[in-house]
């Protein structure tokens, strides 16, 4: 039996909506594909029921009570659907803390949860509550005392037969002007090691192939458009190959994301956020999964934000959360046998 924690995210947004929708969809299947999973929903119980009522799933949610566990956490203030309130900023972090604590081993070496899946949060609300917050990825790393983690997004490409595209990032939430200085030999070495290790241990890939982008247009054009490729990125690829990692590149980012090159790749390592995620989200938005590599536990999330205007309307799509749940279960199963 696997135990999967799901945090419901920003209470004024669609997190509660898509959590209810996704879990009911899974539980209603004639032959549930995750019959060996116990779901642990972390959030305010009354809010979840109220949101289920609002989107026409109230009775079904009540009936599902025996099939899942609601790990109740009280709101900081009453919620107005679609309206942010800094009084609930610490509530959102409380949900994350409960999931993190449950995923980390206790004194006996046992963890309550095998993986955590996170609904979207509103960074501004948390910061307005007086807590500096850059994003899930950085917060999870800090709370788990993990020195380096890697953000990777994955999703099926409908235009290419639903082939899976995975894109990891050497840097995450940085202003663009700071990216070149952040791409150091140590960062690239650590990132490639983490990507290789987790693709093997949590995705079951024996020898993952990683394609590495350049930083500059045309991968620097032999140094005429920047020297990061020559001085930092290509040497990192050479070192990775010497460590047994099947890394290749650097490739010009504007031509890398095409079927001919991606056909034999298990993952792309991009140098910065929009370089890697713009092409991925173009083909997968609404069905992509955000994965944090390098943590001592499995964590996945959605590829979208809180969509305040859709909260409580019944129009929020749960596709990305379902993909995140499926991915978390798959990763947890591989991790259990690695």
From Swiss-Prot:
Matches recorded under Pfam families: PdxA
Binding site for substrate: 136-137, 281, 290, 299
UniProt KW keywords: Cobalt, Cytoplasm, Magnesium, Metal-binding, NAD, NADP, Oxidoreductase, Pyridoxine biosynthesis, Zinc
Chain sites annotated for binding a divalent metal cation: 173, 218, 273
Main location: cytoplasm
InterPro entries referenced in this protein's UniProt entry, alphabetically: PdxA, PdxA_fam
GO annotation (BP), single: pyridoxal phosphate biosynthetic process
One function term, GO molecular function aspect: NAD binding
Pathway(s) of this molecule: Cofactor biosynthesis; pyridoxine 5'-phosphate biosynthesis; pyridoxine 5'-phosphate from D-erythrose 4-phosphate: step 4/5
NADP found in the keyword field: yes
Protein location: Cytoplasm
Necessary cofactors: Zn(2+); Mg(2+); Co(2+)
Gene Ontology, cellular component aspect: cytoplasm
Subunit field text: Homodimer.
Misc. remarks from the entry: The active site is located at the dimer interface.
UniProt record similarity statement: Belongs to the PdxA family.
Name assigned to this protein: 4-hydroxythreonine-4-phosphate dehydrogenase
Species name: Ralstonia nicotianae (strain ATCC BAA-1114 / GMI1000)
